[in-house]
From Swiss-Prot:
SUPFAM superfamilies in alphabetical order: HMA, heavy metal-associated domain (SSF55008)
Any GO MF annotation of the entry: copper chaperone activity
Subunit structure: Homodimer. Interacts with CCC2 via the copper anion.
Function per UniProt: Copper homeostasis factor that specifically transports copper to the secretory pathway for incorporation into copper enzymes destined for the cell surface or extracellular milieu. Shuttles copper to the transport ATPase CCC2 on a post-Golgi vesicle for eventual targeting to the cell-surface high-affinity iron uptake protein FET3. Protects against oxygen toxicity.
Organism: Saccharomyces cerevisiae (strain ATCC 204508 / S288c) (Baker's yeast)
PROSITE patterns found in the cross-reference section: HMA_1, HMA_2
Protein name, per record: Copper chaperone ATX1
Length: 73
């Protein structure tokens, strides 16, 4: 079984539609994504997944949202 990793991204989101778009693209990756936490107020997206960091980063960028930073926790 692959190890679940925790990634955190600082994503520019101005409304619930923005966070909804990010949530929608990440939800499509289930079951490889086991948990998604999005804070519109803090502009943070936490992803728990077995998928590579760069793959998740590209999926978030495809929503058209600016990703200011990201890291593995």
């Amino acid at each position: 079984m692959a190890e679940i990793k925790h990634y955190q991204f600082n994503v520019v989101m101005t409304c619930s539609g923005c966070s909804g778009a990010v949530n929608k693209v990440l939800t499509k990756l289930e079951p490889d994504v086991s948990k998604i936490d999005i804070s519109l107020e803090k502009q943070l997206v936490d992803v728990y997944t077995t998928l590579p960091y760069d793959f998740i980063l590209e999926k978030i960028k495809k929503t058209g949202k600016e990703v200011r930073s990201g890291k593995q926790l």
